[in-house]
Amino acid sequence: TLKNIKTACQAAEGLVKTKKIIKEYKPDIVIGCGGYVSGPAVYSAANLKIPTLIHEQNAFPGLTNKILSKAVDTICISFKGSEKYFKTKKKIVFTGNPVRENILEVSYEEARKKLNITKPCVLAFGGSLGAKKINDVMLGYVKNADESIHIIWGTGKRYYDEITESLKGIALPKNIEILPYIYDMDAAMSASDIVVSRAGAITLSEICAKGKAAVLIPSPYVANNHQEYNARALEKGGAAIIMTEGDITPDKLKTTINGLVNDKAKLENMKQCALKMSTADATSLIYEEIKKLTER
């Protein structure tokens, strides 16, 4: 079709342009993190015999990284099990996803003291913009939530007014905090026991790094349904419970959360499983792979 011809022409043009840029700047290494934009740059570098590395954040690799895997020197993966999607196994190194140092520096006890939390804590959010399905379910849940559980709910700025309007006239107890945006996510994540969220790669890496039990609602609106694969990896590791958009209701969420809070052994086991899946030193591991390639 005409569209396919146009795409092929754009890809060829991208290769020519990136090859020219790489020849001009002479980089020591070219790194790709997926996405079609990285394709021409990494492929051109590989053709010019410049060291190349790709980092796959998700459990299910994107198309660009799968194509590039044949040409690059090193493939860094973030989830154990992802190697089965690549044909060139000898290039694969398990590094995990880097997480922010700040989030690692705040302890559970310090964060709870800072936020004045004394009860089991649930942190719920759908990313910086919010997620409608998570908000719809949380809206029903907080109306009947147990007062023995502290709840921090980040709605996202675009949903906040609508949600506060829906709760008008309802006297929510002090244990429920509803915020348009969680500015101190380091403290909120550190102080929590259970996290209710989507299943983006970095979010899950932070959940594991902090050792939190997770109730995951993967977004069905992402490429290759990669959030479902990410969530399944944590579920398989014993760190998460998955509730799909088609299945979750406020009552089911309440039952799941109460079940974890009331079963301290299960909750603690999920936290420990999350910690076991963590690669808090991912940045160092990736750096070492870069160093190997640039020093060879």
Language model features by range: what are they?
Residues 108-195, 227-232, 236, 243-252:
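Donor-nucleotide binding loops and adjacent catalytic segments primarily
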